[in-house]
Swiss-Prot record:
Involved in protein export. Acts as a chaperone by maintaining the newly synthesized protein in an open conformation. Functions as a peptidyl-prolyl cis-trans isomerase. One of its GO terms (molecular function) is protein folding chaperone. The gene is tig. Its main location: cytoplasm. The keyword DNA damage does not apply. It catalyses: [protein]-peptidylproline (omega=180) = [protein]-peptidylproline (omega=0). Transmembrane segments: none annotated. This is Trigger factor.
Length: 438
């Protein structure tokens, strides 16, 4: 086997590989031994007919596919080793049919790590909203908690209001005659939910438990039951029970019930602390997003389509998992959105391209700045993974195998982005509350 590197262009290595006639014959013999077991030739037991007769009856091409599966992978791997080429994605082959007694040539286009040319990416100016936590953010969080832990209280003497839940009996009549589907008992109705036809719920406001009322309504012209559409109706409604929710009072008792704190002031401080942590996380993510966008514009990163395709497939798999959590398959999603896999792949292609180029840019930056990930840092990260998955450290290391080096690369990329963020000139140009950011 001989291999020749013809050129490297746009992060793809073009190589020509030649396999000797002896290796071709070895591949054809391998294919013959495999194929002959699967066919029956009159006059011979299965697997015993000579190769010449097999080729005569089915044609020489009957052996080509299996012969290529034997010849090409081994020759390709040896060529990569000989030429010291490290592929980053699957190659594309240009292959002709092999001929017995003749050397066999084929070409491979191999995606390789791009030669990244970094521009002036230190000190990039980025503009982000102001994520400062304000007092109204804390107040809103408290209000959300008051509603979350609101108590359900029965109204005995007070009249019903919008938002209350009523237990009612009702029966509807048109021209004095009851109609099918117009009766219900012990029906739970939240006023303002628009569960009933327009005008029904509003007429129950002000009623007390134990009271009754004739509710006059008109069915919409577009009502699903055609025999009722556009007709006037009277519903005899009896209110049996009224419940309302009362927001909790903000005091020490509330703090003790909903948190580990003894006083409302301690809870307030913790709420502000959590909001500030979330705001800082969003601030950093906002800086990172704009910073990466601008940094990539300053760099030359030729990435082969095959590598971007791999990222598209990873994104598709992630999306498919998210859909599965919602009880949908990817095919169902495509049906609902009148789309298909190809359209979706094209839609996410720009995002995939930015992601791939961003990683290569940050890897190059880490290399130029001499950034390394120590064994201690790597082990600390693996320990966190083990804790998250409830596994022993040794077990998760065994499961990860060679993927541990991918983790090391990821940590190095994290260091590079932190470096860029530290060097960036950040201008906060607009205000946005932490609650709105959430």
């Amino acid at each position: 086997m001989t291999a020749k590197l013809e050129k490297i262009e746009n992060s793809e290595a073009y190589i020509e590989i030649e396999v000797s006639a002896e290796q071709v014959e070895e591949g054809l013999q391998y294919a013959y031994r495999k194929v002959i077991k699967q066919v029956a030739i009159p006059g011979f037991r299965k697997g015993k007919a000579p190769r010449e007769l097999l080729e005569l009856q089915f044609g020489k091409e009957v052996l080509f596919q299996d012969a290529l599966e034997y010849i090409v992978p081994e020759a390709y791997d040896k060529a990569l080793e000989e030429l010291n080429i490290k592929p980053i994605a699957q190659p594309e082959f240009d292959i002709n049919d092999p001929e017995s007694g003749q050397p066999f040539k084929f070409n491979a286009r191999v995606p390789v790590k791009p030669e990244v040319k970094l521009g002036e990416i230190e000190g990039i100016e980025v503009e982000i909203p102001d994520f400062q936590v304000k007092e109204e953010d804390v107040i809103q969080k408290f209000e959300d908690m008051r509603q979350q832990y609101a108590q359900v209280v029965e109204k005995i003497e007070e009249p019903a209001a919008m938002g209350d839940k009523l237990n009612i009996d009702f029966e509807g009549f048109i021209d004095g005659e009851a109609f099918a589907g117009g009766k219900g008992e012990d029906y739970s109705l939240e006023l303002g939910s628009n569960t009933f036809i327009p005008g029904f719920e509003e007429q129950l406001v002000g009623l007390k438990a134990g009271e009754s009322k004739d509710v006059l309504v008109t069915f919409p012209e577009s009502y699903h039951a055609e025999d009722l559409a556009g007709k006037d109706a009277v519903f005899q409604v009896s209110v049996k029970r009224i419940e309302t929710t009362e927001a909790r009072e903000l005091n020490d008792e509330f703090a003790q019930e909903v948190s580990q704190f003894n006083t409302i002031d301690e809870l307030r401080q913790d709420i502000r602390k959590n909001l500030e942590e979330m705001a800082e996380s969003r601030r950093k993510e906002s800086i990172k997003t704009e910073l990466m966008e601008k940094a990539l514009e300053k760099c030359d990163i030729p990435v082969p389509d095959a590598v971007i395709n791999m990222q598209v497939e990873r994104m598709l798999q992630d999306f498919e998992q998210r859909m599965a959590y919602q009880g949908l398959t990817l095919e169902q999603y495509f049906q609902f959105t009148n789309s298909n896999r190809e359209d979706f792949s094209q839609k996410i292609w720009p995002e995939a391209e930015k992601s791939v180029k961003g990683d290569f840019m940050l890897e190059k930056l880490a290399e130029e700045k001499g950034m390394e990930v120590s064994e201690e840092e790597l082990n600390e990260h693996i320990m966190k993974l083990a804790n998250n998955f409830g596994m022993e450290v040794d077990k998760i290391k065994e499961e990860l195998g060679d993927a541990i080096e991918n983790i090391r690369t990821g940590l190095k990329i994290d260091k590079a982005i932190d470096f860029l963020i530290d060097k960036a000139v950040v201008k906060e140009v607009a205000e946005i509350t932490a609650a709105a950011a959430e």
